[in-house]
Regions:
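A polyanion-binding, active-site-adjacent surface
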Residues: 2-3, 14, 21, 25-241
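Intrinsic-disorder/low-complexity detector
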Residues: 1, 6-9
Length: 241
């Protein structure tokens, strides 16, 4: 026997696949026949079923958006123009969450592009960041008619997608803009004035509630309190004030 012929040759992958299939069929037959002394449990059969399968690709913003598709899960789909998923840095340290798209967002399919978006841009600039540094999204992805507050059934449908977005981005901080965003993420039925001014915990992420930019447009006297909230975020992010 030559040296080359004595080397161990790799076993084709199809051999292992066939072996797994044979073991699975044998154990299933034994389980159905009432045989004892062998592990024919559903867990073992399930383990064998998954052997050799490629692991599912990791979750991404693209897969979440694909899962949303042309969403028809709640009544907001009847009046929307565009679904507004979110935009910004997919690895952002700071994520802003609003309640839902407005008129301009619905027309353009992008978050915070109307007058509230201009106000938010000024806030982002004031904390020495840009839109490219942060991620922007909303609790609900479709505009509520006449910009009303999202209803509980609409939030219940959309919230799991927001939670998945947050899990993928893994920000260090979340700024919840307005009562709907803060209450939805924190599960606390308190007014935004009672929630703001301090950090809360959201699954290990520091969450700061503050007033929504649209609210500030109509109540400019609340800008000072909002700035105090943003300064707390700046300090925690290590930015000089």
């Amino acid at each position: 026997m030559t040296e080359s012929s004595s080397e161990i040759q790799p076993v084709p992958a199809r051999f292992f696949a066939a072996l797994i299939q044979e073991a699975k069929h044998t154990l299933r037959f034994m389980a159905q026949s009432g045989c004892r002394g062998f592990d024919c449990s559903p867990e073992t059969l399930g383990f064998l079923e998954n052997l050799g399968k490629k692991p599912a690709p990791p979750e991404s913003l693209n897969t979440i958006r694909s899962d949303l598709g042309d969403c028809r899960r709640c009544k907001l789909c009847r009046t929307r123009t565009h679904l507004v998923f979110g935009a910004g840095n997919p690895k952002a340290k700071l994520l802003f969450v609003g309640d839902g798209p407005g008129y301009d967002e619905d027309r353009q399919g992008q978050p915070f592009v109307g007058s509230a978006g201009q106000m938010l841009d000024r806030i982002i600039t004031a904390i020495k960041l840009t839109r490219e540094d942060v991620y922007l999204c909303n609790v609900v992805k479709c505009r509520p008619p006449k910009n009303r507050t999202p209803e509980s059934d609409e939030i219940a449908v959309c919230l799991p997608f927001l939670e998945r977005q947050i899990a993928v981005i893994q920000p260090r901080f979340i700024c919840a803009l307005g009562g709907t965003a803060a209450q939805s993420l924190l599960c606390l039925p308190l007014h935004i004035s009672k929630l703001r001014g301090r950090f809360h915990d959201y699954r290990g992420i520091r969450l700061m509630p503050t007033f929504h930019p649209d609210y500030l447009s109509h109540h400019p006297e609340k800008k000072r309190e909002t700035w105090e909230d943003m300064k707390m975020i700046m300090r925690e992010m290590g930015h000089k004030i």
